[in-house]
């Protein structure tokens, strides 16, 4: 046998990723195009219809004149702006290229082979991806029938191997939330070595007296981290800006494994301007308050079930009856240039998630669904 033949037998024919990597289902974002449609309304990714703050745009453009320079590796200006807006020490803050990066950093810092990370059945898909990417074992906890997260079930799923609990509050794609006394009850039941991750990406939209973001808990507890994003209410999804606050020990661990220049300079500048523009945020909240209520009422009047939402989206449930299913509604809406998010990958095959859009988009969706349910061909 030739030497090359022996080598082929001894080694794989190509580099192979470590076990488990190819078993990960890659994240698939919401659709953004509709073939053959002149005007498209993208309501699939929970982007704000009002766009970013004009001050953020100006800061982004100004920072773009120095693209030859490396950014500040510590994102100092952004952390200081967040600290000023939130009243917290910038040293307790870490910034990332979207909260996705921070979620992955958490998994890689605290979850190893054989370790368990808990997430809810209808939670953000990145939790499972991050856990598997770190070599860990995702533990999926079922939600209640009303799609509310089940604190008792989460507590019951904790074992000696549990290292992290990912909890989106509010949750995407359901729009449900946990009152903060329930979050505190969950935290009180955890061993001190289990890190509770509070993903508050949609927190700015919540208008409930019993809701809290988790900021105070993250500042006072050693095993809590609260994550936030600039992609939603701040309208900076294209720039990928996320941040988190936690104990000094947790922030130190994450900083040790993040990239040395993980935030680009225009993003740092735009984010710093955006978070200090409270008036723009209030306009976005007011728009969402108006149209979230209107859409929920109008869609319910069509005979559809809508899960009560505190976010900038609604989860619409369709019957299994042929001609009236979620998949058929999705195709019908797409033909009209109205792109919603199919959420079968979240375990909700009979539902569509709709972002609160402009007045025009919102009214068009309601009319289109009325036509669909009445049997119109297009």
UniProtKB/Swiss-Prot annotation:
Pathway(s) this gene product operates in, as recorded in its UniProt entry: Amino-acid biosynthesis; L-histidine biosynthesis; L-histidine from 5-phospho-alpha-D-ribose 1-diphosphate: step 7/9
Cofactor: pyridoxal 5'-phosphate
Main EC class the enzyme belongs to: transferase
This protein's record includes keyword Zinc-finger: no
Biased composition (Basic and acidic residues): 7-17
GO biological process: one example: L-histidine biosynthetic process
Subunit structure: Homodimer.
Name recorded for this polypeptide: Histidinol-phosphate aminotransferase
Species this protein is from: Azorhizobium caulinodans (strain ATCC 43989 / DSM 5975 / JCM 20966 / LMG 6465 / NBRC 14845 / NCIMB 13405 / ORS 571)
Lineage start: Bacteria, Pseudomonadati, Pseudomonadota, Alphaproteobacteria, Hyphomicrobiales
């Amino acid at each position: 046998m030739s030497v090359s033949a022996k080598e082929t037998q001894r080694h794989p024919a190509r580099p192979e990723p470590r076990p488990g990597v190819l078993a990960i289902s890659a994240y698939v974002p919401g659709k953004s195009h509709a073939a053959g449609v002149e005007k498209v309304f993208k309501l699939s990714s929970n982007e704000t219809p009002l766009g970013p703050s004009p001050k953020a745009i100006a800061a982004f453009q100004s920072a773009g004149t120095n693209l030859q320079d490396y950014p500040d590796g510590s994102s100092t200006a952004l952390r200081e702006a967040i600290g000023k807006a939130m009243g917290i020490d910038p040293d307790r803050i870490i910034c990332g290229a979207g909260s996705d990066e921070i979620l992955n950093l958490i998994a890689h810092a605290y979850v190893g082979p054989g370790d368990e990370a808990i997430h809810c059945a209808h939670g953000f898909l990145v939790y499972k991806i991050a856990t598997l990417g770190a070599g860990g074992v995702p533990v999926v906890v079922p939600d209640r029938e009303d799609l509310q997260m089940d604190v008792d079930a989460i507590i019951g799923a904790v074992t000696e191997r549990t290292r992290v609990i990912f909890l989106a509050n509010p949750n995407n794609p359901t729009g449900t939330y946990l009152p903060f006394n329930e979050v505190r009850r969950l935290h009180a039941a955890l061993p001190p070595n289990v890190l509770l991750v509070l993903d508050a990406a949609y927190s700015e939209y919540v208008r409930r007296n019993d809701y809290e973001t988790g900021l105070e808990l993250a500042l006072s507890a050693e095993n809590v981290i609260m994550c936030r994003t600039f992609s939603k209410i701040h309208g900076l999804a294209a720039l990928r800006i996320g941040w988190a606050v936690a104990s000094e020990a947790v922030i130190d661990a994450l900083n040790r494994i993040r990239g040395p220049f993980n935030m680009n300079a225009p993003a740092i500048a735009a984010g710093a301007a955006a978070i200090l523009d409270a008036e723009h945020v209030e306009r976005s909240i007011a728009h969402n308050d108006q149209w979230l209520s209107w859409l929920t009422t109008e869609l319910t009047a069509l005979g559809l079930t809508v899960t009560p939402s505190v976010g900038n989206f609604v989860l619409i449930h369709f019957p299994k009856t042929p001609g009236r299913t979620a998949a058929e509604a999705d195709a019908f809406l797409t033909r009209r240039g109205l792109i919603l998010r199919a959420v079968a990958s979240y375990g909700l095959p009979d539902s569509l998630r709709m972002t609160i859009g402009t007045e025009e988009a919102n009214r068009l969706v309601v009319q289109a669904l009325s036509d669909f349910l009445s049997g119109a061909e297009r």
